[in-house]
């Protein structure tokens, strides 16, 4: 190896540096309690950095009206946003379906402590109530999925969507208990409604892939199959004097109320489950409990009693709710008010009565005034309320 001229001189002229011993770092004396505290802090940091389950979802589309702007819908995952941008007409139907299933949910639970109340201008629609894996969450996921199927299927058959129309599979000759008939008319395209609802509604759960996602996917499927369950056969007779020698039939959606009633019964018989270790299926929550079938709604957590305002549990309480003084059911004051008692207010209601038809062409009614007692649940005591918030 060649050395540059003067390199040796420079080496000789350079002062020799004394070697200073460097102390080796020693491990700090850490007590077991400090170690546990550090581990807890690390776990907390990991939990904060992991994506949390937030039920801001496509449900908010129902609050946007006819003008659905995909980028302004909070909570959509990328697949849902892609479908929204590609099919804006279908998104309007999804919004109509959202409004319909929320109305149906509120009808089904109008006499219960939890009455499917929505929160204005809240992207989660129900607040924190759906974060708990409860019966109520099971019902909401099922009926929301059913609402999308029903709305899209109806829009297809009514010619409101360019991507679908009548059911293309109902063609040719068929038979039922009354005999042979020809498929005709415009059968509701349930196949397209189910297919799009599955792709759109299930997209978020398929992305998360946790136990709650498995529960939601199961209940979503229950909702879709419920709509298909109540397809009805409508027919028109052809023949001399309506003899019905030839029938033309088509499949039609039933009123959404039938789906709501059915899912309400499924709610009453919902099965409490736990996820299996591999996270691919369910097992009964306790030994001796029956196993869930494909038509059962499933849930993990017991519901709160919904008696008092509890923001953490998503409970709005029953203070001020109207109740029946004489009923022994869930709408009765004893159950609705959770034993807190009720207030009675006398109110006068004005209704139309003694209506008569006058030629031509008007209906004239009188105004009738009725004084009735309205019973409303008392608010809990202040100390009790503070304990729950």
From Swiss-Prot:
Lipid-attached positions, O-palmitoleoyl serine: 241
Glycosylation sites (chain numbering): 115, 281
Chain segments carrying region Disordered: 1-33
Entry comment on modification after translation: Palmitoleoylation is required for efficient binding to frizzled receptors. Depalmitoleoylation leads to Wnt signaling pathway inhibition.
UniProt-listed PROSITE patterns: WNT1
Effects seen without this gene: No visible phenotype at birth. Combined disruption of Wnt2 and Wnt2b leads to lung agenesis.
One Pfam family recorded for the sequence: wnt
Cell location: Secreted, Extracellular space, Extracellular matrix; Secreted
UniProt GO cellular component terms: extracellular region; intracellular membrane-bounded organelle
InterPro entries, A to Z: Wnt, Wnt2, Wnt_C, Wnt_CS
Principal localisation: secreted
Record-level Gene Ontology MF annotations: signaling receptor binding
Homology family: Belongs to the Wnt family.
Assembly description: Forms a soluble 1:1 complex with AFM; this prevents oligomerization and is required for prolonged biological activity. The complex with AFM may represent the physiological form in body fluids. Interacts with FZD4 and FZD5.
Protein's UniProt name: Protein Wnt-2b
Native source species: Mus musculus
Gene: Wnt2b
